[in-house]
Curated annotation (Swiss-Prot):
Designated name of the protein: 4-hydroxy-tetrahydrodipicolinate synthase
UniProt EC number: 4.3.3.7
Location, primary (coarse class): cytoplasm
Similarity remark: Belongs to the DapA family.
SMART domains for this protein: DHDPS (SM01130)
GO molecular function: 4-hydroxy-tetrahydrodipicolinate synthase activity
Name of the encoding gene: dapA
Quaternary structure and partners: Homotetramer; dimer of dimers.
Class of enzymatic activity (EC top level): lyase
InterPro entries: Aldolase_TIM (IPR013785), DapA (IPR005263), DapA-like (IPR002220), Schiff_base-form_aldolases_AS (IPR020625), Schiff_base-form_aldolases_CS (IPR020624)
Function field: Catalyzes the condensation of (S)-aspartate-beta-semialdehyde [(S)-ASA] and pyruvate to 4-hydroxy-tetrahydrodipicolinate (HTPA).
Amino acid sequence: MSVLGACITPFKADLSIDFAALESVVRSQEHAGNGIILFGSTGEGLSLTYEEKLSILSFVSTLNLNVPIFVGVTATSVQETMSWIDFAQQWPIDGFLVPTPLYTRPGLNGQKAWFDRILSVSRKPIILYNNPIRTGVSLYPEVVKSFVSHPLCIGVKDSGGSAQACELFAESGLRVFCGDDNLWPDMRLSGASGVISVLANVWPELARDYVAQGRPIEAWKKVCSWLNLSTNPLGIKALMAAQKMIECDAVRPPLSIRDLQRRDELADILACRATLQTELLSVCRQ
């Protein structure tokens, strides 16, 4: 599978979880044949309580989805992380997306110990996650290489923003997922073989087709550049609300939708869909 949608968690105006919209979000990924990531930064995992995560897992498990479901794990305590994984893997999920711990900025040996402890408790596959902007530290390529032989370590998501870093991860032999929609063409050339996509939330089929053809497309770049002006998931929720895919573009504190940049360009960004479809068709015919 080349695309996993980094799914939003839709909220109602009162900031409670909108389960009807959530079903629509994950069903759209299933229809496109994309995998699903829950509770990542796009899904505002840090703003969800333990009980809310359980309610989402319970709800999604009743949908009998026919695509892989991975659960994002974000914490600073290794014991808390291990306990959460031990509990969450009782549900019918397919694995976990695990970054370096937040805030503490561990070095090479600390990162090895962190992932070693987590892998020791997991019975599901794990994708390691490099996201230095969010966590405060880069995932060391040496750490990735040290877990290559572990049967449950199946890949790396790289949101480091550099094709060079992607190449180092790819040298390990593990599968690398690009964590930035806009960088996919460059990271594909550097060894990435899939994308964990934010844009798949709003245009799941187009994301699938864009990743499959693997070449730069100007309309895609334009949308990604607009999204990157604001903290994720402000932009993607605004796009989805404008297309009536979700009830509203609400995000939970400390995020605020009032921080969305260039809202006046929203209609122009939505119009990129038709251009993107045309460009993808043109590329496929070449």
